[in-house]
Swiss-Prot record:
UniProt name for this protein: DNA mismatch repair protein MLH1
Consequence of changing G64R: Defective in a mismatch repair assay
Similarity remark: Belongs to the DNA mismatch repair MutL/HexB family.
Organism: Saccharomyces cerevisiae (strain ATCC 204508 / S288c) (Baker's yeast)
Pfam families listed in its UniProt record: DNA_mis_repair, HATPase_c_3, Mlh1_C
Other noteworthy facts: Present with 319 molecules/cell in log phase SD medium.
Listed GO biological process terms: meiotic heteroduplex formation; meiotic mismatch repair; mismatch repair; reciprocal meiotic recombination
GO molecular function, one term: mismatched DNA binding
Summary of subunit composition and partner proteins: Heterodimer of MLH1 and PMS1, called MutLalpha, which is the major MMR MutL activity correcting base-base mismatches as well as IDLs. The heterodimer binds double strand DNA independently of a mismatch with positive cooperativity and has more than one DNA binding site. Forms a ternary complex with either the MSH2-MSH6 (MutSalpha) or the MSH2-MSH3 heterodimer (MutSbeta), which recognize and bind to mismatch DNA. Ternary complex formation is promoted by ATP binding.
InterPro entries xrefs: DNA_mismatch_repair_CS (IPR014762), DNA_mismatch_S5_2-like (IPR013507), HATPase_C_sf (IPR036890), Mlh1_C (IPR032189), MutL/Mlh/PMS (IPR002099), MutL/Mlh/Pms-like (IPR038973), Ribosomal_Su5_D2-typ_SF (IPR020568), Ribsml_uS5_D2-typ_fold_subgr (IPR014721)
Top-level taxon of the source organism: Eukaryota
């Protein structure tokens, strides 16, 4: 069955047409701004909110709109600038189709306030879908017109989603306003964001073209311009070409789109742009971008302005010849000034400025063009060297007062305090164990890994004595490891930092699953955030209970969730050192102190029967060889007939020297290994175990304690203070130095890093810091 052809509803037609003309807020503003210029306005003020999406208001002091014309103002094809099609051949105004306001009213809420010179008051009226909503209301107002556009694209969600950020849209608006401000002589422009006290752009009507370019761009652009002019060329229908182009001293790595006005219309002409850039490529140093502003006037009869919905393109007769004429003229202008050029040069010298260069001798010998160029270079070198000797003005509000690569003096005091090897008489507080013995595993199957790391030593350590753990974890708190003298098998020497190093070749890994996990980490890297962490300065702990710390980068102060950061850090270390971990040896010579998995799982009320505990232990025990080989998690079973109740945890992986995870979390570690890890899928399994190890390694929270509370004992207060000092020292001397060296920040932790202050803004408020 064939579909019947039907006429589209008028509202659908109007929305389609509006979508072709009004693509973004900047298109709506351009149309309204051109109407203001056509109305002979001498001042145009623009107000923008949320990139022009929420509010876009333009106010001019032009001729205004007659009250009688208001009912049809926003209807399509209503205009005061054109009566018949032949008038297009002589059109001199920006507008001619009568579609701009109509299109805007179909995708936004429009309110117009206008007053002509003859009226005693202004008139205000609102529009929707091209129709006037109510009769015009008299209001107070000045001569001219104010058009308020609100909620742009409120009825086209797809177009709204396609727009870029508010700042990007506002930048586009500023760019277009600036280009019209440069070209529109005797017309002033201002543009600012809603709520801002200062204008983002302000151009007075009396400004010259040079002043306008200086205001819109900057001084370096305006001070390196030459005037460009071509007189009338009869056979090409070319009336004139006037503008400003950069000279050969102009240096800019940033590309500035050429400003082309053809018959006073802002257009893009790719052929002309390429031709002029080609000319400049013969003169400017490689990598420099030129500045070009040209106003081209062509006989209106030779120009077709009705070729693009947004009027950004025009077609004209003798296009190739006109472009060639302009390019040749530019070549001639640049050739004329290519006899001399100023270069920035500097010299390093310890002598007095007068002895740097024999400047007078060089000037006296200036007899020809070559020596003139040499003199210019010498003069500039002398000036630069002289200025370098002067003390540069220090900008206090942009001064970075600390060096991220410089260590604090306290970092040299911590190494001797990390471990104690003098026996069991002196016991560490908190959950950090005292290291007394180290062993290592020599079994490691060689795999292939795309890593560039050299073979290194395998690090393994023993730990003992956990203090101040919750009562229900008493068996971990009582756990002790005998001193070195108690074990005759310890024949390996202990280094000053408390580790026994045994030469062990690095295992090469060629597992596809691990490669994919590493690629996934690489793909998730946020470059800017990684740079912040790589060049951070650690400030201190803000809240030990919520695991918040402050860091500084450059001129900014950030608040970070160090728990989240450490989780990602240890996961990445696990991926990098996969199958190459050192060992933390947990098993004691005293059998009663061994860590039995069954006892650890007894901490959980939901595992109230032997079967549920043994189910978890069975999963882990079945994978014990893999856990030992890949993760240095060694399990042993001394029971008869491999009784699952006798499975013991002998070792944990060592991810970072100087840091031992809190063994208080061992019950949760074993529980989650059995419950949360997917043991069926290889990649999910390897990833899940690494994440559980990273979770184990996250520093403990330190619950807040009111030290002024009289009900607390002195031991409890001292314990709280010691735990705070311990976590602070651990973060400053162990974890954050590792974060600076190794951490690749993923995008999803952006929510865990918050900028709380920056130096320039603080100076704006306090005028000092």
């Amino acid at each position: 069955m064939s579909l019947r052809i039907k006429a589209l509803d008028a509202s659908v037609v109007n929305k389609i047409a509006a979508g072709e003309i009004i693509i973004s807020p900047v298109n709506a503003l351009k149309e309204m701004m051109e109407n203001s210029i056509d109305a002979n306005a001498t001042m145009i003020d623009i107000l923008v909110k949320e990139g022009g999406i929420k509010v876009l208001q333009i106010t001019d002091n032009g001729s205004g709109i007659n009250k009688a014309d208001l009912p049809i103002l926003c209807e399509r094809f209503t205009t005061s600038k054109l009566q018949k099609f032949e008038d297009l051949s002589q059109i001199q105004t920006y507008g001619f189709r009568g579609e701009a306001l109509a299109s805007i009213s179909h995708v936004a809420r429009v309110t117009v306030t206008t007053k002509v010179k003859e009226d005693r008051c202004a008139w205000r009226v609102s529009y929707a879908e091209g129709k006037m909503l109510e009769s015009p209301k008299p209001v107070a107002g000045k001569d001219g017109t104010t058009i308020l556009v609100e909620d742009l694209f409120f009825n086209i969600p797809s177009r709204l989603r396609a727009l870029r950020s508010h700042n990007d849209e506002y930048s586009k608006i500023l760019d277009v306003v600036g280009r019209y401000a440069i070209h529109s002589k005797d017309i002033g422009f201002s543009c600012k964001k809603f709520g801002d006290s200062n204008y983002s752009l302000s151009v007075k009507p009396s400004y010259t073209v040079q002043d306008r370019i200086r205001t819109v761009f900057n001084k370096s652009v305006a001070s390196n311009l030459i005037t460009f002019h071509i007189s009338k060329v009869e056979d090409l229908n070319l009336e004139s070409v006037d503008g400003k182009v950069c000279n050969l001293n102009f240096i800019s790595k940033k590309s500035i789109s050429p400003i082309f006005f053809i018959n006073n219309r802002l257009v893009t002409c790719d052929l002309l742009r390429r031709a002029l850039n080609s000319v400049y490529s013969n003169y400017l140093p490689k990598g420099n971008r030129p500045f070009i502003y040209l106003g081209i006037v062509i006989d209106p009869a030779a120009v077709d302005v009705n070729v693009h919905p947004t009027k950004r393109e025009v077609r004209f007769l003798s296009q190739d010849e006109i472009i060639e004429k302009i390019a040749n003229q530019l070549h001639a202008e640049l050739s004329a000034i290519d006899t001399s050029r100023t270069f920035k040069a500097s010299s390093i010298s310890t002598n007095k400025p007068e002895s740097l260069i024999p400047f007078n001798d060089t000037i006296e010998s200036d007899r020809n063009r070559k020596s003139l160029r040499q003199a210019q270079v010498v003069e500039n070198s002398y000036t630069t060297a002289n200025s370098q000797l002067r003390k540069a003005k220090r900008q206090e509000n942009k001064l970075v007062r600390i060096d991220a690569s410089q260590a604090k003096i306290t970092s040299f005091l911590s190494s001797s305090q990390q471990f104690n090897f003098e026996g069991s008489s002196t016991k560490r507080q908190l959950s950090e164990p005292k290291v007394t013995n180290v062993s290592h595993s020599q079994e490691a199957e060689k795999l292939t890994l795309n890593e560039s790391e050299q073979p290194r030593d395998a690090n393994t350590i023993n730990d003992n004595d956990l203090k101040d753990q919750p009562k229900k974890k008493q068996k971990l708190g009582d756990y002790k490891v005998p001193s070195i003298a108690d074990d005759e098998k310890n024949a390996l020497p202990i280094s000053k930092d408390g580790y026994i190093r045994v030469p062990k070749e690095r295992v090469n890994v060629n597992l596809t699953s691990i490669k994919k996990l590493r690629e996934k980490v690489d793909d998730s890297i946020h470059r800017e955030l990684t740079d912040i962490f790589a060049n951070l300065n650690y400030v201190g702990v803000v809240d030990e209970e919520r695991r918040l710390a402050a860091i500084q980068h450059d001129l900014k102060l950030f608040l970070i969730d160090y728990g989240s950061v450490c989780y990602e850090l240890f996961y990445q270390i696990g991926l990098t050192d996969f199958a190459n971990f050192g060992k933390i040896n947990l098993q004691s010579t005293n059998v009663s102190d061994d860590i039995v998995l069954y006892n650890l799982l007894s901490e959980f009320d939901e595992l109230n029967d032997d079967a549920s505990k043994e189910k978890i232990i069975s999963k882990i025990w079945d994978m014990s060889s893999m856990l030992n080989e890949y993760y240095s998690i060694e399990l042993v079973n001394d029971g008869l007939d491999n009784d699952l109740k006798s499975v013991k945890l002998k070792s944990l992986p060592l991810l970072l020297k100087g840091y031992i995870p809190s063994l208080v979390k061992l019950p949760f570690f074993i529980y989650r290994l059995g419950k949360e890890v997917d043991w069926e899928d290889e990649q999910e399994c390897l990833d899940g175990i690494l994440r559980e190890i990273a979770l184990l390694y996250i520093p403990d929270m330190v619950p807040k304690v009111d030290t002024s509370d009289a009900s607390l004992s002195e031991d409890e207060k001292a314990q709280f203070i010691n735990r705070k000092e311990h976590i602070s020292s651990l973060l400053e001397h162990v974890l954050f130095p590792c974060i600076k060296r190794r951490f690749l920040a993923p995008r999803h932790i952006l929510k865990d890093v918050v900028e709380i202050a920056n130096l320039p803004d603080l100076y704006k408020v306090f005028e000092r810091c």
